[in-house]
Design a protein with these regions (language model features):
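Histidine-anchored nucleotide/phosphate-binding helix
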Residues: 19-34
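Early exported N-terminus immediately downstream of N-terminal targeting peptides
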Residues: 6-10, 38-40
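Short helix-terminating capping/connector loops at secondary-structure junctions
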Residues: 1, 32-37
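A cross-taxonomic marker for long C-terminal extensions/tails that follow the last structured domain
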Residues: 52-119
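Domain-start "cap" segments at the beginnings of catalytic or binding domains
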Residues: 1-7, 118
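Short internal beta-strands
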Residues: 39-44, 76-79
Length: 119
């Protein structure tokens, strides 16, 4: 079976539950079918706020974010968005990967064969 590479793009805070549910479904499928995946979530614009650990704790998203990260899902965060909203990298979960520009990360991943999903 071919390994699927998927990048989920999120730029609106209200879409986090849908993205995290989609991730959960893909990870469950991986367990059930032994299919291999490379998964990344790219957060930019206002969606970066939910990757601040304190905010995630207060919105009850923390477990739904930590579980996929522990299973190898990459959470990439746009540095341009962090700068725009004056968010320090230190406020993010330690597993977050800060990328210079979200749009470039999306383009690079798509050129590497990642499927683009924007719930």
């Amino acid at each position: 079976m071919v390994k699927l590479k998927i990048i989920f793009h999120i730029d609106e805070p209200n879409n986090w539950p849908m993205v995290l549910e989609s991730l959960k479904n893909v990870l469950n499928n991986a367990k059930e079918t032994n299919r291999k995946y490379e998964l990344e979530v790219l957060a930019n614009s206002m969606a970066v706020f939910q990757l601040r650990e304190l905010i995630a704790r207060n919105t009850h998203l923390i477990d739904k974010i930590i579980e996929p990260a522990e299973q190898g899902v990459v959470f990439a965060v746009c540095n341009n968005s962090l700068n725009k909203f004056n968010i320090s990298k230190d406020e993010l979960f330690s597993f977050c990967k800060v990328v210079p520009a979200g749009i470039i990360e999306l383009a690079e991943k798509q050129s590497e064969g990642y499927l683009y999903i924007k719930p």
